[in-house]
């Protein structure tokens, strides 16, 4: 038996990073109760999404994340050829996702964000602190992808133009400030305060929602929806967070307000997945490369 176990190959570095990315997406989807988002209770403000579809979509993205990490290891330079390679792989991953979901956009924003971060992590696996990985991802995001086919403006791009807000592209080019300054610090604070992991992750999501100019919310509900999201998320945290009785009441009020406006904070959900991915990279710090 021991000889058999010894022959089982360790997952490669690229496989580990792809596993972490898909795991972050699945854990984000499973987290409950998220205000107006798909979770274990139901579909939130969505009519075309459910938890089963979110799981299937996340698993369908594993080959794309794996290929991005492999590209980073083989090309080994943070330059335009790598940027264009992962852009192509991301588009292929999106096509696979849409085939699995029947055309429903479940994780387009997450492909962009986590694709950059998987690539950035694989480029320098000895330097996996969240700030280091996010800065490398930002440098990648700023590079032009000359192979990007012409497309009509997305919902997010139209929202950016209408309201003059930052979108997913700007968030990445800035090094994911919503995660580095808000999501990750709140996750750690809530853990340090004794919260269980579910409540710590909910608090991290709320910290992101409290400051993010979420283009998904703006698309569905305009500035009224954005104010509802930001003010409501802040109210939960001020009340003591999702683990407190007052915080749970405020969380319920937030959800009811968002549902009334048909607003779903999908951008914040993507950044929570980023938060969970970066958080899981830290235990890999200092580990021998062969052990990853």
UniProtKB/Swiss-Prot annotation:
This is Probable 2-(5''-triphosphoribosyl)-3'-dephosphocoenzyme-A synthase. It holds the Pfam family CitG. Its EC number is 2.4.2.52. Belongs to the CitG/MdcB family. Signal peptide: none annotated. GO terms for biological process: prosthetic group biosynthetic process. It catalyses: 3'-dephospho-CoA + ATP = 2'-(5''-triphospho-alpha-D-ribosyl)-3'-dephospho-CoA + adenine. It comes from the Bacteria. Involved in the formation of 2-(5''-phosphoribosyl)-3'-dephosphocoenzyme-A, the prosthetic group of the acyl-carrier protein of the malonate decarboxylase. It comes from Azotobacter vinelandii (strain DJ / ATCC BAA-1303). It is an enzyme of class 2 (transferase). GO terms for molecular function: ATP binding; triphosphoribosyl-dephospho-CoA synthase activity. Keywords: ATP-binding, Nucleotide-binding, Transferase. The lineage of its organism: Bacteria, Pseudomonadati, Pseudomonadota, Gammaproteobacteria, Pseudomonadales. InterPro entries: CitG, TriPribosyl-deP-CoA_syn.
């Amino acid at each position: 038996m021991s000889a058999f176990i010894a022959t089982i190959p360790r997952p490669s570095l690229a496989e580990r990073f792809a596993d972490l990315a898909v795991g972050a997406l699945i854990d984000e989807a499973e987290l409950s109760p998220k205000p107006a988002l798909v979770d274990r209770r139901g579909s939130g403000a969505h009519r075309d999404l459910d938890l089963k579809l979110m799981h299937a979509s996340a698993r369908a993205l594993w080959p794309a994340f794996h290929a991005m990490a492999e590209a980073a290891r083989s090309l080994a330079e943070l330059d335009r050829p790598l940027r264009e390679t992962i852009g192509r792989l991301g588009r292929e991953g999106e096509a696979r996702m849409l085939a699995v979901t029947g055309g429903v956009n479940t994780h387009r924003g997450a492909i962009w964000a986590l694709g950059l971060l998987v690539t950035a992590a694989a480029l320098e696996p000895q330097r996996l602190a969240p700030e280091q990985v996010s800065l490398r991802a930002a440098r990648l995001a700023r590079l032009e992808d000359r192979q990007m086919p012409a497309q009509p403006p997305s919902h997010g791009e139209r929202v950016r133009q209408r309201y003059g807000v930052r979108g997913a592209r700007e968030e990445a080019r800035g090094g994911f400030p919503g995660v580095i300054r808000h999501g990750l610090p709140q996750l750690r604070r809530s853990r340090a305060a004794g919260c269980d992991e579910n409540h710590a992750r909910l608090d991290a999501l709320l910290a992101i929602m409290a400051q993010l100019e979420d283009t998904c919310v703006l698309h569905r509900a305009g500035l009224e929806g954005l104010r509802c999201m930001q003010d409501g998320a802040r109210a939960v945290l001020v009340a003591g967070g999702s683990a407190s009785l007052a915080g749970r009441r405020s969380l319920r009020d937030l959800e009811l307000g968002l549902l009334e406006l048909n607003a779903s904070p999908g951008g914040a959900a993507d950044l929570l997945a980023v938060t969970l991915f970066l958080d899981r990279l830290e235990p890999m710090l200092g580990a021998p490369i062969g052990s990853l």
